[in-house]
């Protein structure tokens, strides 16, 4: 049986954690970092890059680099690369595959299962799509868990048995959640949750980009948004400036050769952004966090003074303005500083994986559905069957009837949201229940049952009590993927994994070959007088052979040429060693003859005295 991990699949960065001896450990990736950028790039040579390597080449490969894909999950978004369309699930799966690979390299065994976290305010389609991404990556998704709940689990279990109320303020790269939880005696219960799926650190970055674009246009009359490479450089500079402003009062943004003017003269961008100005241009974004906060306090039916701990989650909470606002909203309470906002969610996910696998005992996680669920009834009204903040898993039934005489069927339209008019909410899916016996309106009894599983995924059943006819739907319409499509993507991902592995190995062979040729040329140059012309010619010919094979695609030919060069290089090394050994013997003889010279002996004595003085001085 393979291992289970906890994964925080973030908009900007992702993290993977595992239980080792019952304790959660955050796993460093192959580059040595504990966070992996959620960036995927398709290099022009066909290689798929994920993480830091993808982020590093974004400026020169703008159209083939995808970032912040989490903002598109659960929609019909796709991106075309080399005449192939990739869905948000497939791009997310690439990130998950890297995390899985890195975890397997660390553990030395296969990773089969995962708990993946999502923002608490994610809708059904977004949860379903996240689960599909895990399946495409070759993972059995044990559970989809809300990020604030995972954070509270990681934070709360260290606090012992005492019951306490925890507020989790989670501002990530692309989403915002605030949740209120009660923890005590091994039970983590969510009281209320609210949020904004379109608010995150990316929006703060974009404000800096807009500010820079405006400044540059007023100075030079050139709109940098028309230049994709310049825009990518601005995005990267904006992110760095935002991070810098969390620690200092000013950030200098200097981008040489950002573009050229009409006469092809290079233009530079050089601006200073103060923290005060940054807070001014992003104030409305900050204000948007207040409504969900107040909603949660109201839904939970508590006062701010009853909150025991405040936990900040997500890298964006490092911004001083965010910390100050949270203190203000919670009546001056200092947020907990003992939690790493980038890692705490993955740690909680690993703990939940341990709970589900039976490795962690006496822990019960009671999550809630973030939005109300219901169906459209006569007049376009939203009739709610399950109210928001209901603990899941849950099941609710309600009986409806027909609106017309002799109505043969009913159309069940399932919505998620808080608006009173159904069409103003999110349509999750629809299905038809036919075969209703002819009867006056109001007579047939149609029982509609909503069943939400522990992942927050919705199943709806409609049953005619008179005929016993029944129809069921598992809401999948939002993700837009059938099981056949998911299976195809899984096979595609597996094929690509093998292909990527082969391509990586081939690239390593090429890199090693290039390095060997360079080192050989350098070695020949440095030891020019110590090797015969015949041997030198053989080595140079072998090096040329490697260079020629590198121009082609035949990897076996490169290996053969490298083996030949290694053989000739060893011969050259042996010849140089023998030449130096012979020269050393000659010098030793000369040294013995000169040992009788008194002047030389005096010089040695002086050197020894000096070094002894130095030693004494050092002491």
UniProtKB/Swiss-Prot annotation:
Q: Which residues carry this modification: Phosphothreonine?
A: 175
Q: Quote the PROSITE patterns the UniProt record gives.
A: HSP70_1, HSP70_2, HSP70_3
| Assigned keywords, A-Z | ATP-binding, Chaperone, Nucleotide-binding, Phosphoprotein, Stress response
One GO molecular-function annotation for this sequence? unfolded protein binding
Question: CDD domains in the record, alphabetically?
Answer: ASKHA_NBD_HSP70_DnaK-like
What triggers or suppresses the expression of this protein?
A: By stress conditions e.g. heat shock.
Q: Which domain of life is it from?
A: Bacteria
Which NCBIfam families does the UniProt entry name for this protein? Answer: PRK00290.1, prok_dnaK
What name appears for this protein in its UniProt entry?
Answer: Chaperone protein DnaK
Which organism does this record belong to?
Corynebacterium efficiens (strain DSM 44549 / YS-314 / AJ 12310 / JCM 11189 / NBRC 100395)
Instruction: Identify the coding gene.
Output: dnaK
């Amino acid at each position: 049986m393979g291992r289970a991990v906890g994964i925080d699949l973030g908009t900007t960065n992702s993290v993977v954690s595992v239980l080792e001896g019952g304790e959660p450990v955050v796993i460093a990736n192959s580059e040595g970092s504990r966070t992996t950028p959620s960036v995927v790039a398709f290099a022009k040579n066909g290689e798929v890059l994920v993480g830091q390597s993808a982020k590093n080449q974004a400026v020169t490969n703008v159209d083939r680099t995808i970032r912040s894909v989490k903002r598109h999950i659960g929609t019909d978004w796709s991106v075309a690369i080399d005449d192939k369309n990739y869905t948000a699930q497939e791009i997310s799966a690439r990130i998950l595959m890297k995390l899985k690979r890195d975890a397997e390299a660390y553990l030395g065994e296969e990773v089969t299962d995962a708990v993946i976290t999502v923002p608490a305010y994610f809708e059904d389609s977004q949860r379903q799509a996240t689960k599909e991404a895990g399946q495409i990556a070759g993972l059995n998704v044990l559970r989809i868990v809300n990020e604030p709940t995972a954070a509270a689990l990681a934070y709360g279990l260290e606090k012992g048995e005492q019951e306490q109320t925890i507020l989790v303020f989670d501002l990530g790269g692309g989403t915002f959640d605030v949740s209120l939880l009660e923890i005590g005696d091994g039970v983590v219960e969510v009281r209320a949750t609210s949020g904004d799926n379109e608010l995150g650190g990316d929006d703060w970055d974009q404000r800096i980009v807009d500010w820079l674009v405006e400044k540059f246009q007023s100075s030079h009359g050139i709109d940098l948004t028309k230049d994709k490479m310049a825009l990518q450089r601005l995005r990267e500079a904006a992110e760095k400036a935002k991070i810098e402003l969390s620690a200092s009062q000013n950030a200098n943004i200097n981008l040489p050769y950002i573009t050229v003017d009409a006469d092809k003269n290079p233009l530079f961008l050089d601006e200073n952004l103060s923290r005060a100005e940054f807070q001014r241009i992003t104030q409305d974004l900050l204000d948007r966090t207040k409504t969900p906060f107040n909603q949660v306090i109201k839904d939970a039916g508590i006062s701010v003074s009853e909150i025991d701990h405040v936990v900040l989650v997500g890298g964006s909470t490092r911004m001083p303005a965010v910390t100050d606002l949270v203190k203000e909203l919670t009546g001056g309470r200092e947020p907990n500083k003992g939690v790493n906002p980038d890692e705490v969610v993955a740690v909680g996910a690993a703990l939940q994986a341990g709970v589900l696998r039976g490795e962690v005992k006496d822990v019960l996680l009671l999550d809630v559905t973030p939005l109300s669920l219901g169906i459209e009834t006569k007049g376009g009204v939203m009739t709610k069957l399950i109210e928001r903040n209901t603990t899941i898993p849950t099941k609710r039934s309600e009986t409806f009837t027909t609106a017309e005489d002799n109505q043969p069927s009913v159309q069940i339209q399932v919505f998620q949201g808080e608006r009173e008019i159904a069409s103003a909410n999110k349509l999750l899916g629809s299905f038809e229940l036919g075969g209703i016996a002819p009867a006056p309106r109001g007579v047939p009894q149609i029982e509609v049952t909503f069943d939400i599983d522990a992942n927050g995924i919705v199943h709806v059943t409609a049953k005619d009590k008179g005929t016993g006819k029944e129809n069921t739907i598992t809401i999948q319409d939002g993700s837009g993927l059938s099981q056949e499509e998911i299976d195809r993507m899984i096979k595609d991902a597996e094929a690509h994994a093998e292909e990527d592995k082969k391509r990586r190995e081939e690239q390593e062979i090429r890199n090693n070959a290039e390095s060997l040729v360079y080192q050989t040329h350098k070695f020949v140059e440095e030891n020019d007088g110590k090797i015969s012309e015949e041997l030198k010619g053989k080595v140079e010919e072998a090096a040329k052979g490697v260079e020629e094979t590198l121009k082609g695609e035949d990897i076996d030919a490169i290996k053969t040429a490298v083996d030949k060069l290694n053989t000739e290089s060893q011969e050259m090394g042996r010849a140089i060693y023998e030449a130096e050994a012979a020269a050393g013997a000659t010098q030793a003889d000369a040294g013995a003859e000169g040992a009788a010279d008194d002047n030389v002996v005096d010089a040695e004595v002086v050197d020894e005295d000096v070094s002894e003085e130095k030693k004494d001085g050092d002491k």
